[in-house]
Curated annotation (Swiss-Prot):
Pathway: Carbohydrate acid metabolism; 2-dehydro-3-deoxy-D-gluconate degradation; D-glyceraldehyde 3-phosphate and pyruvate from 2-dehydro-3-deoxy-D-gluconate: step 2/2. It catalyses: 2-dehydro-3-deoxy-6-phospho-D-gluconate = D-glyceraldehyde 3-phosphate + pyruvate; 2-dehydro-3-deoxy-D-gluconate = D-glyceraldehyde + pyruvate; 2-dehydro-3-deoxy-6-phospho-D-galactonate = D-glyceraldehyde 3-phosphate + pyruvate; 2-dehydro-3-deoxy-D-galactonate = D-glyceraldehyde + pyruvate. PANTHER family: 4-HYDROXY-2-OXOGLUTARATE ALDOLASE, MITOCHONDRIAL (PTHR12128:SF66), DIHYDRODIPICOLINATE SYNTHASE (PTHR12128). Its EC number is 4.1.2.14, 4.1.2.51, 4.1.2.-, 4.1.2.21. The active site is at residue 151. GO terms for biological process: glucose catabolic process. The record marks 123 as: Proton shuttle. PROSITE patterns: DHDPS_2. Optimum pH is 5.5, and 50% of activity is found at pH 4.5 and 7.5. This is 2-dehydro-3-deoxy-D-gluconate/2-dehydro-3-deoxy-phosphogluconate aldolase. It comes from the Archaea. Optimum temperature is 65 degrees Celsius. It shows high thermostability. At 70 degrees Celsius, the enzyme does not lose activity upon incubation for 2 hours. The half-lives of the enzyme at 80 degrees Celsius and 90 degrees Celsius are 20 minutes and 15 minutes, respectively. Homotetramer; dimer of dimers.
């Protein structure tokens, strides 16, 4: 989910409700607030909690809460809060800013998992954070039953295939790059956690068609998903995602610096 903003850069809860109803209408399986597209680092802990609470109170869909932070104390606080309000799972990427080796990343997750019983999806997005290797994921998976899967947004298909080798009935592997979802499903991925669902149902249609009509799914990727991703990719992430949502819904939305309007045509 994006985090809709008003003209002053504050969270717009009316627009958020529009987004929730849209996502429910296209039949996504989960809502994922406060992730990368939701620009979670731009918000205070209180803002993040308030947004998570609003989403929980206004949707009966299962929710995966973004709890990312380099501060373990902040992660623990967000996970406890999320559990207390009835959110089903958390999504957590490795720490960012300071370069860490795999041992440090393992201990980061171990500290958090030892303090929380909440189901967790590990989030590999090395464009923005430290990279977590499949072997580290494997070690955490074997030690903690609450590790239920991984979202991989690395765009590294070989690395993704290594993640896929970990999948089983209790461990799901999701693709985070919209234009790689079809290929990932071919390789055995559980599904996708994809940003264009904020304003387009292409990914959802692709996923459901794939089960019954592979050729139709491939056509959706070629005609809908890839052109949209190429258009969005011309602009600073994730500004165009916000503007696309605002324009599609006739919302006078805003941006929180360093975000800005990019002028995308829809």
């Amino acid at each position: 989910m994006i985090t809709p903003l008003d003209a002053h850069g504050n969270i717009d809860y009316n627009a958020t409700n529009i987004l929730i109803k849209y996502l429910e209408g296209i039949n996504v399986d989960y809502l994922f607030p406060m992730g990368s597209t939701g620009v979670f680092p731009y918000f205070t802990l209180k803002e993040r909690k308030d947004f998570l609470k609003f989403v929980r109170e206004n949707s009966k869909k299962p929710i995966m809460a973004g709890v990312g932070s380099s501060s373990i104390n902040e992660v623990n606080e967000l996970m406890k809060f999320s559990m207390d309000i009835g959110i089903e799972a958390a999504v957590l990427m490795p720490p960012y800013y300071i370069k860490l080796n795999q041992e440090a990343i393992y201990h980061y997750y171990k500290e958090i998992l030892s303090s929380n019983d909440m189901d967790l999806l590990i989030y590999n997005i090395p464009q923005f954070t430290n990279k977590i290797d499949p072997e580290t994921v494997k070690n955490l998976k074997s030690e903690f039953s609450s590790v239920k899967g991984v979202k991989d947004s690395s765009a590294d298909i070989r690395g993704f295939m290594e993640m896929l080798s970990l999948s089983d009935d209790d461990f799901a592997v999701f693709q985070g790059q919209d234009d790689l979802l079809f290929t990932s499903l071919e390789l055995g991925a559980s599904g996708g956690v994809c940003g264009t669902t904020n304003f387009s149902d292409g990914i959802v249609r692709l996923y459901h068609e794939y089960k019954n009509n592979r050729e139709m799914a491939l056509k959706i990727e070629k005609n809908d998903v890839i052109p949209l991703m190429k258009k969005l990719g011309k602009y600073q992430f994730p500004n165009a995602y916000y503007e696309y949502f605002y324009k599609k819904n006739n919302i006078n939305g805003g941006y929180r610096p360093p975000m800005y309007r990019v002028g995308i045509e829809i």
